[in-house]
Amino acid sequence: MRFLPVRALPKPERLRYLFSFDFDDTLFTLGGPAEERSIFFRTMRMLRSQYGVLWGVNTGRDPVYLREGLADMFRDDAEAFAPDFTVTMERNVHLADAEGRLMPGAAWNDDCAVAHDSLFTRYGGMLESLMGQLESRFSGLGLRRQGNDAFSLVVDDAYGLDEVSCVIQDTVGPYEEIVTQRAGPYLRFSHRDYNKGTSLSFVASRFGIPSSHVAIFGDGHNDLDAMRHLPEAFRCCPSNAAQEVKDMVARGHGYISPEPRTRGVLDGLAHGVFPYFGMKAEVLKEDI
């Protein structure tokens, strides 16, 4: 993550708030208007200087795929600056160093790797058998094999994961250490102790920011862990969010935007986050 075209800004004198954004279909709209991205960065610059707000991306993308996405988001935008943190694959943490480069959160990532190596060593045979059964049972399902993500899959239709997830749960339910992370048409097996929620808690603790000063933006099933794990945080989702996410937002301190994706983030800042935290701020917009 250190080779991004732009770097994070110097830290504010006082770190007061932490805003965490899911990437795909929340913060980033593929092919979306460049003006929306520019509005976001101008607004975050203002919040940083006036209210000590840090921000980051909390995603299921792997580091390489996120780097590509961030490069698209930064392209041709003079206001763009890198996030203060990223969480990739729902579990691997990178934090901006003094020079604004995103560097691995060594202790957390090392412990995470050990936990997953142990998990997949002990249960790899069972998971291999399960994935073979899923591949033969469900059309349009593909297995994804990567060195850092050995047990994951993708389906043609995100809604098809409902039935797939039920079959998976019947098999892995008795194994408390094994959970699944689901985002759109993607699903991966992982260790229960490492998810968007526990990763975000680690990030907040490193910055010394209490969970009551955290805002979580997300649209997918894997965002539920963050909202559950930090119940005092403010929650926000765009209109395209999964129904389970909307239900979670409605049950806590939160705001469901009537706008989708990036527009939903900008609307959520203006009509959700700012009033909740008492920020006398506005989204620096023209027309969105």
Question: Residue locations for each model-derived region?
Answer:
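Short acidic, Gly/Ser-rich segments with clustered Asp/Glu that frequently serve as metal-coordination loops
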Residues: T26
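Short glycine-/acidic-enriched loop or helix-start segments at secondary-structure transitions
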Residues: L30-G31, L66-E68, D97-A98, A226, ...
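Mg2+-dependent phosphoryl-transfer enzymes with acidic/Ser/Thr/Gly-rich catalytic loops
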Residues: R14, S190, G197-I288
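Non-catalytic pre-domain segments flanking phosphatase-related domains
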Residues: M1-F23, G31, I39-S49, I288
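Short, aromatic/basic amphipathic alpha-helical patches
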Residues: L70-M73, S165-Q169, E244-G252
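Active-site phosphate-binding/coordination module
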Residues: S38-R137
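Conserved acidic, metal-coordinating active-site core of Asp-based
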Residues: E128-A215, H221-H229
